[in-house]
Amino acid sequence: MLNLARMVDIKPQSGTHVAPINLKLMEMEQFARYTLEKEILNRLRGRVTPRQEEEYRSNIETYRVLEADMSQPDRTARMLELDNAFHRKSFELCGMEAHYDHMLASLQHVERIRKFSLQTEENKSVCSSHTAILEALLHGSADDVSEALESHLSRYKQSVAQARSVHPEYFIDE
């Protein structure tokens, strides 16, 4: 399975090695994610209840507090969980959470970069990006939702640039 997902390279008589992050596959994964998530957000746009809005805002605030406290145990894993919960929320509210779970499971190369980005300065924009998505969801047009989501999901390019400058051997452009 990992070989099919291009997560490992199997070399007969030599062994199995972690495959470099395939930037072309990562771009495809990210486009599929953007397309699906944009559709879900637009189905929900303008229909979020005050209680649901508060749940979104609570998630953002919890993330902000965790982000500021480097001493928190399991901080990186918890931040990733909060990020996933923020994005999954719109799928849940549309009754399509299984679609989110399936999508997340298919994002092999993107997930590797997401985990790296939690340890960089680029990560500092998550709360403001999530707030922009929420505001577009509450009060914006389809174009506003699209722009906020595109801005947020394209952050991975900065993470790739940072990681690639330090470890170019971790990436391939195939």
Predicted segment positions?
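Short helix-capping/hinge motifs at transmembrane helix termini and TM-loop junctions
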Residues: 45, 95, 119-120
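Conserved amphipathic alpha-helical segments that form helical-bundle/coiled-coil interaction surfaces
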Residues: 24, 50-115, 126-135, 144-159
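Solvent-exposed, flexible loop/coil residues
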Residues: 22, 117-120
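Active-site loop of classical SDR/Rossmann-like NAD(P)-dependent oxidoreductases
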Residues: 122-124
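Short, flexible segments with low predicted structural confidence
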Residues: 1, 11-12, 27, 61-62, ...
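Short linear motifs at protein or domain termini
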Residues: 1-46, 157, 161-174
